[in-house]
Amino acid sequence: MRVIGIIAEYNPFHAGHEYLISEAKRLVGDPRAVVMTVMSGPFVQRGSLAVSPKHVRAKEALLSGVDVAIELPFTFACAPSERFASGAVELLYRTGVVTDLAFGVDCKDPSILMELADVNPDEEVLKTALSNGRSFPAARAEAMISAYSGGADPELVSDTLRQPNSILALDYIKAAKKMNTGFKIHMIPRKEGLSATSVREELNKADRTSMSSIADRLNGIMPDKALSVMLSSISRKEFLIPDESSYMNDAALMVRREQDLTGYAYMSDGLDGFIRNNIGGDLQTKHFTMPRIRRAIASMMTGQRASYVEQEKHAQYIRVLGFSNEGKYCLKIMGKCARLPILSNASDALELYSSNPRLKAQFELDLLANDIYASYASMEQGYEWKLPPVKVK
């Protein structure tokens, strides 16, 4: 059985995601291949609240070609590229069933990513760039370019290393190689104009109280079934699109209450002082990327400490968000060969608390992240405990 692993956020699910799934199956050469996605939960990689709850996004995906959806724990989902990629790739690997890894790429020559995956950044160049005030992604790109000695066009290498999606793709490859996963890797060029960012922009332009306004904006860029899931969930008042402004206002209040921010994850290099001085106003700066600022704020809001991020490098469980009929069979096989506990319901974690303190710490961080999300999406606190896996036929 071929099982294609896909790392995604589905924020929200759009036509580009559907295209990637169909292309992955074509490249694998098996239209019946199982598609397993590991996806972000309440917070996404760039540090923001997801546009809709994870169970809604999982259902969108399951009705559009995904067979099994599992959740990437908060500590990896809301993290820099390397940590995000490493956590997601390892989670797919530890299911024991994934054979292939597919992801989208933006670069003109995807093969350059395989070559760059073997290049280690020049540490001296990295340190110098950081000391000169460059953001970490920019400094890392400079250090990679300096260390690269291959035959590709230097301008192509430079352009590739300055594209966020290419950096993510590069980190997927690096993680898969480092872990000796044996995954067959499929890099799929993205279709122009199809991105979650463009979908969210259209959503922001719509009258969020009007289903017809939202439908008009998103028709054609979200698959019909995925759009239907989002609209029906909003109309039934299962959630409201998260109120980012209220979230940031509460973050500002917390900053004023906290005497020391430096212990929270991603608050190093003077970011704590910058946030304290600017949280109520303009957070744009050339020294820190917005994703890093948002991840630091998310860590503060959830209580995630820098020491925890430093110590915990591995996912401790496989949280199942949903599955199709084909996915049900895959999960049955997973139950025999997975190298992590499988949690179909939140209550499954409680049985492992006493014997696995690392699982307890990671799961309780997830619970808190979910409750914070619920606060800004008009959802019930503790909804995670009442959330069974989504099942679609």
Regions found by a protein language model. Give the residues of each.
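N-terminal catalytic cores of NTP/NDP-binding nucleotidyl/phosphoryl-transfer enzymes
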Residues: 1-57
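Conserved acidic residues
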Residues: 2, 33, 67, 98-99
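N-terminal cationic-hydrophobic initiation segments that often serve targeting/anchoring roles
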Residues: 25-29, 62, 92-93, 177
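Generic structural signal for well-ordered secondary structure
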Residues: 50-54, 62, 81, 85
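Acidic, Ser/Thr-rich peripheral helices and adjacent loops at domain boundaries
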Residues: 56-59, 124-125
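A glycine-rich helix N-cap at a beta->alpha junction
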Residues: 58-73
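Active-site cores that bind ATP or allylic diphosphates and position pyrophosphate for catalysis
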Residues: 71-393
